[in-house]
Amino acid sequence: MAGQSRPPHDRPEHLEPTMLPTTTFSPPFTITRASHVALAVTDLAASRDFYRDTIGLVVTEESDDAVYLRGLEEAAHHSLVLRRAEEAKALHIGLRVRTDADITAAERYFAGRGVDHERVEVPHQGPTLRFRDGVGTHIELTSSMETVPRKMAAFHEFTAGAPQRLDHYQVATHDVQTATDFWAGLGMRLSEYTAKDGTDELWGTWMEVKGNTHDLVFTNGRGPRLHHFAYTVPDATHLIHAADVAGATGFGEEIDRGPGRHGLSNALFLYLRDPDQHRIELFTTHYQFIDLEDDPIRWDVSDPRRAQQWGMPASRRWFFEASEFPGEPVRDPLLTATPATLEDYLSLH
């Protein structure tokens, strides 16, 4: 392959013993997928309009204080909740577990390990449990939701990017190793990872439970903060249409990155910022990761192809800005590896 001495997924022989986690394939409770995210927003109507008209999500229900939205193929009541607040925050990211018994098992597991957790009543959801993971990420588990009609065949209602379903989250954390170990212990499997050059020090990890490349991503940075949440779209033309609609609705300058193609996950992508600067990704074409003999793909942090296969790199704000969780201290990262940014690229050219 031109300009490349070995495939990016080959682990160099000179590296020290691996720091990669061992996945627990019989976890204490069963997580099935990324499910729903809740955001605190300062202008509820403006945020609703952005996600409905510029992104293309379906409004399931709204009140004076909250708006519930979903993708076109989703039967669950919501995958995005917007809540009116004085200050913009990422309230929590949600994961589904298989049954009500898994919520009880999670309570038992966290109690035995001193992990703070709370059973809560949440509108439109079944048994729900909130906790913080090993690096302070605010998590909500639920075993069920009210169901609504899928809109995937209502092609006359497709607008903007026509998002199909919520797929994953990316969280900036001060300690990628601790975060990765925590979730591997709960059954998540590493599909790809970025390491500090010449080492297996983890700079970023892509972890999955549903058989594609990621449900939950951790990257090195000040955290915990929610970098983005992501929805699949039908194809590449919908990414371009989403960009056109963003320009037409006054959000052209809020296109944060792309369109482009990641090396990690192989996805075509487009990132946008909402009126409170929360970041959403629309993407398509990632791959299956199911067979247990598949090893995780490794990338050097200095390799620009990991983040973008063509075009210029992302700006500093894409790498370093993210949404904080309420009341959660933000810590400086343990690693100092710094990705190449658009500003770095322009200074050299």
For each feature predicted by the language model, list its residue ranges.
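Conserved active-site tyrosine of GNAT-family acetyltransferases
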Residues: 47-52, 110, 136, 179-184, ...
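Core segments of cupin and vicinal oxygen chelate
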Residues: 29-76, 120-123, 130, 171-213
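A cross-taxon signal for low-complexity, glycine/charged-rich
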Residues: 1-10
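Conserved short beta-strand elements that form part of the metal-binding/catalytic scaffold
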Residues: 57-90, 137-146, 192-227, 233-236, ...
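Vicinal oxygen chelate
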Residues: 9-27, 33-42, 85-174, 193, 202-207, ...
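Surface-exposed interaction/gating patches
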Residues: 161-253
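The feature marks the first
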Residues: 12-49, 53-108, 112-118, 323-349
